Amino acid sequence: DLTKEDKFNYAFGIKNGDYKFRRDNREFSVDKENGCINPSLLSIKNFSTKIAELLYSLKDSQYETFTDLLEVLRNEGLAESRIQELIKMNYFSEFGSIKYLEKLTEVFSWFFKNKKYLTQFKKDTVYELGIDFDIFRRNCGSETAKNFMKINPKGIISEIMKEYENLETTEMEVIRYRHDVLGYLDIIDKKYAGYCFVTDLNSEYSPKLKLYALANGNEIPVKIDKKTFKNQPLKRGDIIKVLKQDKKPKTKKVDGKWVKLEEKEWWITEYQKY
């Protein structure tokens, strides 16, 4: 759900900022340059003042690649799990898409252990990871029957990642990733008119859903008839576009019979799942 602050900002036309590398996310702050209020990393579970201060201290540093930044962050003691959560929040978007950076972080972890790069690598491990031996041969000083010696990890990482340069993340995936980290949604954007995020679901009778409307931040209770739901089942965390809906009278069981009430409720009759 949106916080009171988010609703206030939206009502008065104050733009919500975002969690972004090089921005001040140490606490809620007015960002005059971008005309918005930036959120605080401290509002995210497991993020401390120390982490927020570290990230902000790097705002003016230049990094040729995300690998260089990863090296700094790991040497400063930032846990890989926190880095992964920041990636999911699109915090490091200047370096590439979420999926690309997730893959790069995985590859980086193969070569960076205990705050330093490996200098040799077992051939068995290269084979298990499915990496072309020629990549290692181009980036090592020598090799034995079992190991590649004096390796150039950054060169190897760079070559491996060429295969993933076009790895994109859809807008709907970005929204889902954000929810995974925050545990709620704070997105309000009119370009998402008709798009909803399933926040709750009870399919015991006629399926009841709670939908978060991405265009305005409202949470809407709706129902779907069993046949429609069976043809296109949904679960919590799904994103749908509502194509058709209808307002029908609520029903209540009285003396063993279903009676229509004056109060009405929304039923979704057609939707597209993303």
Residue ranges of each PLM-predicted region?
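Noncatalytic, beta-rich nucleic-acid-contacting surfaces in large DNA/RNA-processing enzymes
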Residues: 1-274
